[in-house]
Amino acid sequence: MTRSLSALIAIPVAISAALVFIVGPSMAQGTGGISALYPGDEGIEAHPSVIFVEQFEEGSIANIVPRWGDARNPNGMQFSSDVPPGSPPGHSLNIPWVGGGVNSGGHLYKVLRPGVNDTIYVRYYIKYPASGRYAHTGIWIGGANPVSEWPDPQAGSRPNGDDRFIAAGEQNNVINSFEHYDYWMGMHPDGTGAYWGNFLLNNPSVQAGKGQWTCVEEMVKLNNPTTAFNGEHALWLNGVKVSHLGPGFPRGLWSGGRFTQDPAGSPFEGFRWRSASALNINWIWLQNYSPDDPTGFSSTMLFDHVVVATTYIGCLGATGAATPSAPTNLRIVRSE
């Protein structure tokens, strides 16, 4: 269900720190997305490239869960009247957590049928709290073969290539910046030989601001043919592309499971997400997993305006994107 829109004024939302601009293949950015055609996302589900829309406007959480499929701790979820700038009045989804092992958050997981065999874009809004030790957050994108009706990340193990992959972007609690968290058959082990999600940006200035709404968009492009390393993964914050990796770009330096984008480094090898055509993009996973806070701590994480499409979506607003403030201290990383 979408919101009624009577009047809408785009409110600029700035990324909260200096950004690194990644110069890669030409890709839509800022005002070029399909959201420009649907102010406030009203009616965006009618666009032919849109696969799924969730605006959390049902009468109850119980009415939302069936549209997704699998849910963890739905009884702990709530609606909030706090919505992003550019949104018509309505609801966002609040996933709270309570420290000391009482409640570590919750999730909504959706299987995409049919699966996507080329490129997918997922845009959503998230409001991180001002404090708290959240671990995994946002919306992860991935594939499973065979299709799984519930999350099965198999944390700490490298995919074989015909079984699964994960492409994610989240505010990272290890390096305290917004970061990739990716599992694929070509991922690198950490210094101990273990396989945890690879960090692929490593720039402390790239932040999803705490206590404010952030528009996040991800693009995942599968490798075709399955023998190629031409898969890609890109991230936008508030309409600004902050990372884009693919075959031969950007340059950077590997250290264990971390790739730091740096023009003095070697070209990124590209993603071979899969080795079998039966594996495609077939799930999204909205989650707040926050198990590490002490007894007595409680906080909330808000989500809104989820759109899944096969073309770039862009942020909310009368022009289809929130206009970010001009960042400073830019560093240009050129692809070759």
Regions found by a protein language model. Name each.
Residues 4, 73, 165, 332-335:
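Positively charged, low-complexity intrinsically disordered regions
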Residues 29, 313-329, 333-336:
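Low-complexity, Pro/Thr/Ser/Gly/Ala-rich linker/spacer regions in secreted
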Residues 28-214, 218-319:
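Low-complexity, Ser/Thr/Pro/Gly-rich disordered linker/stalk regions
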Residues 1-10:
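N-terminal secretory signal peptides that target proteins for export/translocation
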Residues 9-24:
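Bacterial N-terminal signal peptides
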